[in-house]
Regions:
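C-terminal luminal/periplasmic domains and tails of membrane-associated envelope-modifying transferases
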Residues: 1, 413-663
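Membrane-interface transmembrane helices that cradle and orient dolichyl/undecaprenyl
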Residues: 1, 116-117, 156-173, 183, ...
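Transmembrane-lumen/periplasm boundary regions of multi-pass, lipid-linked membrane glycan transferases
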Residues: 18, 37-46, 60-67, 76, ...
Length: 663
């Protein structure tokens, strides 16, 4: 008993710690656009007794909003007692995530207790794989539906197996109904559980005939179906009671609630993703029948793969003692879920998460049998299973908190996966924000980005969508991989990507984002190039009787490698220099041109003081750059050169300037 309690505590702590540490990391698009607001509105509706207002989405997401509301209540309690300061957007998100995270840890622990009764030798490893699979951990840290649906579906399935294996049957039947009801309140695909549980009851109702013939087999099928029907109807009735009890909208406006529920399934789930998908290197609204097989292969770890690959071998080896009914129920559920998801046009890899814990249970069975076989061959390998599990733990530590970036390294990991699957849900925006915030000129304009609300909490300046390129006073633009894969706004991105990216945000081999600086504004287009990498887009000019101010708009296309000075000279009609200045072209903000990066856009006003006695007339303005150590000018390779007899070699002619001296 003491050992069992310790194991339950271990499973709970592992599941909790992997999901609770560092919850204020980044926002996913669905959280920031949907679930934060839905949770706040749901909580307010419950508090005010406005039951009809608990219809916030057709998913319906009721269990998720209940759990996130728990986190919201904990946050408000901590604020009221003065335990915390008012949290920012990310801190608020972390509190809302806390409720679902606690639920995951508790539900996985319940799963372990059920597995102890079904397969005591494999229960601990199965529960730990359930707790430690990167795919489940990644989604279990979010305010989102699929990981929660996975827990409820798996527990309902395990409980129905126990209903046919261990008394009291009514208790396990009721427990399975409870979890199925919670699954139905979470997301529409839980309807798959209704035929799944029915078929499981048929498979478990009676022992199969020892010798399978057509008469004996058909008799067994008929008797199993007839025996399962009464229990199934009771089970279904209890599940529906749970649904009605926990969704207040069904108490007052059941027609509206159910209408939204089925409209979501038919209207949203029954069509290809409106924002597009990406698979095997091309944008495709419906990725086709191989999508889940290939994407799941990449989401599994090598250890999980090993366990699954061992299953056929040890099933054959133990064919005389293998628990075929339970194997049929578990394996059949996985295959059935994959089949239904594959048959629909809308596909995301997370849609098969409800089958993932069952896959982990099967993988644990395979791993334990493999370890037992290895121990027979080499007794020194008795610690193989713990070592493999420890390796999985090291993998999780390495990927924290970017578990969504995990792809099987044996298949090329993220470096290969980024060219095969749609990648980017908001992860990496924290690093984008950190890099941009560190730039000296970050406050000189707005930032453009896909998924702007996922980036905004990390920046001190406004973030707008890429579509605002022509109307926003934008300084930087973020090109996010997901948008390129979906071929969103191709014209805007083509213009942004015409430049050179300042940096690439790479996480675990995946290039998530490229940061570009947008061209600085100028009034006079004047293309020119100095050396091999410093390009002038144009310039702006203003003047007073005392001063000319020239603002060149530079585009750094290659590193310069030296600290240059800029000269700005003014000549009269006789070719005599009447004013000039030699300064650093980047001013105080970017004084050393050797530090200028490829892709950087720089526009610093250069003041040129005019002599007080300068007469009215037309003057020639020239500009160039030189190395102050050698005095050598940077070659002018593009642009109209000034008269070398007047201005010297490699001086750019900026045109004639009319100056009126009113004194």
């Amino acid at each position: 008993m003491q050992r069992s309690r310790a194991q339950v505590a271990l499973v709970f702590l592992v599941a909790l710690l992997l999901r609770v540490i560092g919850l204020a990391d980044f926002l996913t698009a669905d959280e920031v656009h949907h679930w934060i607001t839905r949770t706040e509105r749901f909580s307010a509706a419950i508090s005010g007794g406005r039951w009809a207002e608990t219809i916030l989405t057709g998913h319906p997401g009721v269990t998720l909003m209940w759990l996130a509301s728990l986190g919201l209540h904990l946050e408000r309690t901590a604020l009221a007692w003065g335990w915390i300061m008012a949290p920012d957007r990310l801190g608020h998100l972390a509190w809302l995530r806390l409720g679902p995270v606690l639920a995951h840890a508790l539900l996985i622990s319940v799963g372990f207790l059920l597995l102890q009764r079904l397969m005591p030798r494999h229960a601990l490893l199965a529960a730990l794989l359930w707790a430690c699979s990167p795919f489940l951990v990644a989604h279990g840290r979010l305010i989102h539906l699929d990981a929660l649906l996975a827990d409820f579906c798996t527990l309902s399935l395990l409980a129905i197996i126990l209903a046919y294996r261990e008394p009291p049957q009514r208790f396990w039947l009721a427990l399975s109904s409870l979890f199925c009801g919670l699954a139905l309140l979470t997301k529409g695909p839980a309807l798959i559980m209704l035929p799944s549980i029915g078929l499981s009851m048929v498979a478990l109702a009676l022992p199969p005939p020892p010798t399978w013939t057509w008469p004996s087999g058909s008799t067994w099928v008929v008797r199993s179906i007839m025996g399962a029907i009464p229990r199934y109807l009771v089970w279904l009735g209890m599940a529906l009671v749970v649904v009605v009890a926990l969704w207040p909208a069904l108490w007052v406006v059941p027609d509206q609630a159910l209408g939204r529920y089925f409209s979501e399934i038919i209207g949203n789930g029954g069509r290809a993703n409106g924002d597009g998908q990406f698979f095997l290197g091309r944008s495709d609204a419906d990725p086709g029948p191989l999508f889940y097989l290939i994407s799941s292969a990449y989401r599994l770890t090598p250890i999980e793969w090993l366990g699954l690959l061992c299953i056929p071998l040890f099933m054959w080896h133990q064919r005389g003692t293998f628990d075929w009914p339970m194997g049929l129920v578990l394996g059949g559920f996985v295959l059935f879920w994959f089949f239904i998801m594959t048959s629909g046009p809308k596909k995301f890899d997370r849609y098969v998460l409800p089958a993932w814990p069952t896959l982990m249970i099967l993988a644990a069975w395979g791993l334990n049998n493999f370890s037992a076989w290895m121990r027979q061959q080499r007794p020194a390998l008795r610690w193989l299973s713990p070592v493999l599990l420890a390796f999985q733990g090291v993998t999780l530590a390495w990927y924290h908190p970017y578990y969504l970036s995990y792809y099987n390294p044996l298949l090329g990991g993220g470096q290969v996966a980024q060219h095969m699957f749609l990648i980017g849900w908001g992860e990496g925006m924290d690093r984008v924000g950190a890099w941009l915030t560190a730039q000296r000129d970050i406050n000189e304009g707005q930032v453009l980005s896909a998924l702007p609300h996922t980036l905004q909490p990390f920046l001190p300046v406004p973030v707008q969508a890429v579509e605002a390129l022509d109307r926003a006073n934008a300084n930087y633009a973020v090109v996010y991989r997901e948008s390129l894969q979906r071929e969103a706004n191709p014209d805007y991105y083509a213009r942004i990507q015409a430049g050179t990216p300042l940096t690439t945000i790479t996480i675990h081999g995946i290039d998530y984002a490229w940061i570009y600086q947008l061209p600085k504004a100028y009034t006079t287009p004047w293309p020119a190039q100095f050396g091999s990498g410093l390009y002038l887009r144009g310039y702006s000019l203003s003047h007073t009787p005392q001063q000319l101010t020239v603002t060149p708009a530079w585009d750094v296309r290659r590193p310069i490698g030296a600290d240059l000075l800029l000269f700005l000279h003014l000549y009269d009609s006789t070719g005599t220099r009447v004013a000039g200045v030699d300064v650093t072209p980047g001013g105080d903000a970017f004084p050393q041109t050797s530090d200028w990066r490829s892709g950087q856009q720089i526009a610093v006003p250069i003041p040129l003081v005019l002599p007080a006695d300068l007469s009215t007339g037309t003057y020639t303005l020239v500009m160039g750059l030189y190395d102050p150590r050698s005095g050598e000018r940077l070659p002018l390779s593009i642009g109209e050169a000034a008269n070398p007899g007047m201005a010297g070699a490699n001086a750019l002619w900026l045109g004639g300037i009319e100056i009126a001296n009113d004194s």
